[in-house]
């Protein structure tokens, strides 16, 4: 590949920009503590995982053997026998959520998708793309779904086969919907377990809860039907990706034969990135679960440190149990832009992903927020 001098200079400028901002992220859930340099040589090849990793494919350059290992690992941590599961490495959390909703729609074609107003924005888009009826449910103060409102709307709609989109860590507050509570409440109104579907969006917390001492319900053992997790968030990856796992019996109803590549396919995207499979494989092979527990404990400790610092000066910061997302009042625009914070209404958050090995970046943010919020308070009082 030959670039013009101007294009070479442009690429070099972007390289230096990336180096400068490599560890900038404190407002969005993307870990930057990864090193996949051992895999760089594979970027010489067009590796395409089109189709089903468990079957033969006529496209020779695939990483199916590695994808099988990845899926076996996630079946284990999400507590479903490997032979009873199927899933794949996706392009990201939205594709995983779409896959789960697609399975649910095929199982219950005329049913309504119920999700809380704190659910990721992409779910509304998914409902439109899949032409599913949908219903937005109110949220509790901490970001969990409002269980009373959920049941009220299911009863009002006379829904016999509700499709529940459960958050295992909401985007802004890290709230985890109580899967067991949802099932109990549905049973109380006479809806049997076989008559509804629960998809779990565990984009960030899916790689936290398996490694803490007292996790909230999140897995197939707790009653879910499918789950997705992002690869670029808690795990860390230079390329956005994700993993989705579902019950094999539900996947088989959408599977189709593809003569062109001599295999079966039940994925959303068809051609899939074989390189991200290698990244996820290397990530799970290079750490033990004990090391992951230590990594998660560090992140949780940093989150609590941030809460304590805010609260020590009277700023009402908080976090949900087992969450590395710290919520606090939204500062002035120049502050949240300076630190690249995610904001929603009158709240902002910081997320203590694993590349924050010490408190320096957190302290810099907190110092600015304290000065901004306390200064605003003094100006209001003075006025």
Curated annotation (Swiss-Prot):
* Name of the molecule in the record: Histidine decarboxylase
Describe the protein's quaternary organization and the partners it interacts with.
Homotetramer.
Positions modified as N6-(pyridoxal phosphate)lysine? 233
According to its UniProt record, which cofactors does this protein need? pyridoxal 5'-phosphate
Top-level taxon of the source organism: Bacteria
Annotated PROSITE patterns: DDC_GAD_HDC_YDC
Point out the gene that encodes the protein.
hdc
> What keyword terms does UniProt attach to this protein?
Decarboxylase, Lyase, Pyridoxal phosphate
Q: What is its EC number?
A: 4.1.1.22
InterPro entries referenced in this protein's UniProt entry, alphabetically = Group_II_Decarboxylase, Hist_deCOase_bac, PyrdxlP-dep_de-COase, PyrdxlP-dep_Trfase, PyrdxlP-dep_Trfase_major, Pyridoxal-P_BS
Gene Ontology terms: biological process: carboxylic acid metabolic process
Task: Write down the Pfam families for this protein, in alphabetical order.
Answer: Pyridoxal_deC (PF00282)
């Amino acid at each position: 590949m030959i670039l013009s001098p101007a294009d070479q200079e442009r690429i070099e400028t972007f390289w230096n920009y990336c180096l400068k901002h490599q560890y900038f992220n404190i407002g969005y859930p993307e870990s930057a503590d990864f090193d996949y340099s051992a895999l760089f040589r594979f970027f010489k090849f067009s590796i395409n995982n089109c189709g089903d990793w468990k079957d033969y494919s006529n496209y020779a350059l695939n990483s199916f053997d590695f994808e099988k290992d990845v899926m076996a690992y996630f079946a284990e941590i999400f507590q479903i026998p490997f032979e009873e599961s199927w899933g794949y490495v996706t392009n990201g959390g939205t594709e995983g959520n779409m896959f789960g909703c697609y399975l649910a729609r095929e199982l219950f074609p005329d049913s309504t998708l119920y999700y809380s107003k704190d659910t990721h924005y992409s779910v509304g888009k998914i409902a439109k793309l899949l032409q599913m009826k949908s219903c937005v449910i109110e949220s509790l103060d901490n970001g969990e779904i409002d269980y009373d409102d959920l049941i009220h709307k299911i009863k009002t709609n006379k829904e016999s086969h509700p499709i529940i989109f459960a958050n295992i860590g909401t985007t802004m507050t890290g709230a985890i919907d109580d899967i067991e509570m949802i099932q109990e409440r549905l049973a109380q109104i006479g809806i049997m377990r076989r008559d509804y579907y629960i998809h779990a969006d565990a984009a960030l917390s899916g790689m936290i809860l398996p490694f803490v001492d007292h996790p909230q319900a999140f897995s197939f053992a707790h009653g879910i039907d499918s789950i997705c997790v992002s690869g670029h968030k808690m795990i860390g990856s230079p390329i956005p990706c994700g993993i989705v796992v579902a019950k094999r019996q539900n996947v088989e109803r959408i599977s189709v034969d593809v003569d062109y590549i001599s295999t079966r396919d039940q994925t959303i995207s068809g051609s899939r990135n074989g390189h991200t499979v290698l990244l996820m494989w290397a990530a799970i092979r290079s750490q033990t679960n004990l090391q992951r527990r230590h990594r998660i404990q560090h992140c949780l400790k940093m989150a609590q440190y941030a809460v304590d610092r805010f609260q020590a000066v009277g700023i009402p910061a908080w976090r949900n149990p087992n969450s590395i997302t710290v919520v606090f009042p939204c500062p002035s625009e120049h502050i949240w832009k300076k630190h690249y914070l995610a904001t929603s209404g009158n709240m902002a958050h910081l997320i203590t992903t694993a590349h924050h090995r010490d408190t320096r970046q957190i302290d810099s943010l907190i110092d600015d927020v304290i000065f901004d919020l306390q200064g605003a308070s003094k100006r209001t009082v003075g006025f």
